[in-house]
Curated annotation (Swiss-Prot):
Belongs to the universal ribosomal protein uL6 family. This is Large ribosomal subunit protein uL6. InterPro entries: Ribosomal_uL6-like, Ribosomal_uL6-like_a/b-dom_sf, Ribosomal_uL6_a/b-dom, Ribosomal_uL6_bac-type, Ribosomal_uL6_CS. SUPFAM superfamilies: Ribosomal protein L6. Part of the 50S ribosomal subunit. The lineage of its organism: Bacteria, Bacillati, Bacillota, Bacilli, Lactobacillales. Keywords: Ribonucleoprotein, Ribosomal protein, RNA-binding, rRNA-binding. GO terms for biological process: cytoplasmic translation. One of its GO terms (molecular function) is structural constituent of ribosome. It comes from Leuconostoc citreum (strain KM20). This protein binds to the 23S rRNA, and is important in its secondary structure. It is located near the subunit interface in the base of the L7/L12 stalk, and near the tRNA binding site of the peptidyltransferase center. GO terms for cellular component: cytosolic large ribosomal subunit. Pfam families: Ribosomal_L6 (PF00347). The keyword Ribosomal protein applies. The gene is rplF.
Length: 178
């Protein structure tokens, strides 16, 4: 039994959910998102509540039931509130700068690393050591944040690198000297 799949999604004011075949579309004040759902899962919209049911109880369908409900709930949250990931740069001389539609990271390489803006995402640099990625799609925000973090992942000896806000880096002990 999928406990998450059986939960009902309550729609906030100004958000509409519609379904055409297997494509679910969510419209809200921040934009519109669409996603294809599995054919084994059916969706019903009654007033301000969205419910999901599955046609069989095999393991794959149970997994799809909860996943589909979670994906649509994230779409509803995205078009109503949006998602934000904050990254921190830790290290001597590490800095980020935004010029026009380009994010430039100086993180200890012999060259700066550039990222172009994505059409549906917003990248902000409130200060030289902080980068904020925001948008309506949780998946796209997380993907861009992961790409930025992968430029210089935190290393375990000094803790230098790009990390998510609140991320704890497990530190290792260095070599023992004689």
């Amino acid at each position: 039994m999928s406990r998450i799949g059986n939960k009902v999604i309550t729609l906030p004011a100004g958000v509409e959910v519609s379904q055409e075949g297997t494509v679910v579309t969510v419209k809200g004040p921040k934009g519109t998102l669409s996603r294809e759902i599995a054919s084994q899962i059916s969706m019903s919209v009654e007033g301000t509540e969205v419910a999901f049911t599955r046609e069989s109880d095999d393991n794959k369908t149970k997994a799809l039931h909860g996943t589909t409900r979670a994906n649509v709930a994230n779409m509803v949250e995205g078009v109503s509130e949006g998602f934000t990931k904050t990254l921190k740069l830790v290290g001597v001389g590490y800095r980020a700068a935004k010029s026009g539609s380009k994010l430039t990271l100086s993180v200890g390489y012999s060259h700066p690393v550039d990222f172009e803006d994505r059409e549906d995402l917003t990248v902000e640099v409130p200060d030289a050591l902080t980068v904020k990625v925001s948008g309506i799609s949780k998946q796209r925000v997380g993907d861009l944040a992961a790409e930025i973090r992968a430029v210089r992942s935190p290393e375990p000896y000094k803790g230098k690198g790009i990390r998510y806000e609140g991320e704890v880096v497990r530190r290792k002990e260095g070599k023992t000297g004689k």
